[in-house]
């Protein structure tokens, strides 16, 4: 496969790829890693093979490989070939985390990560009343200028930050409860909300790819401006009442989401 360097549009009318050559090479190799064509632990083609395949100079190939190293997709050691990291991408099944944890059990996200042999941790960054963004306010059906209780945390796996989470709760639900206190909640907020009389009945996800904000870029230690996966999840209780709206942001090159469903 050859990466063309011309800016001339193709005959079918597609716009030219204006990225630098090393970025295009990294993009093709990244796709092969994430699709499994380059399996975990497998060596990447040699520099000579990549130079021939992409008609590129040695320095360009090295820049492309450095991009993949910075993204934690491959690892290189002196005197050895560059290989695909064992945990190149994690598949998340949102439905596995929605039910409240059993009494005394840890939050489901932590428990599910442990089942996969990963060391997961949540760090609570802030808890306070705020005016949420317009999409969150609409999801919670808040009046104009009405506030919500924000619980802001960052999730890490094996010491690496992987997800930035901002959960918002109507003050009528959260004010005066542990949800509004700056401390962790055993079993997570779903279990506490159920105890408070607001069991989760339905969750709706809206997933989009976004360019990371400055906050997201820094918190997730992103190596480049690769897109992030942004999920707006709205949780409803009895009588179709929204009780939680959560904005979750994951590094797009490290995660994929899996949804299981049947036709309506």
Report residues per predicted region.
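C-terminal all-alpha effector/ligand-binding and dimerization domain
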Residues: 12, 119-264
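Short helix->loop/beta-hairpin flanking segments within DNA-binding domains
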Residues: 24-42
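A short alpha-helical element within helix-turn-helix/winged-helix DNA-binding domains
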Residues: 36, 41-55, 68
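HTH-adjacent hinge/linker in prokaryotic transcriptional regulators
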Residues: 2-24, 52-53, 63-139, 143-144, ...
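Residue-level "edge-of-site" marker
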Residues: 45-46, 64, 81, 126, ...
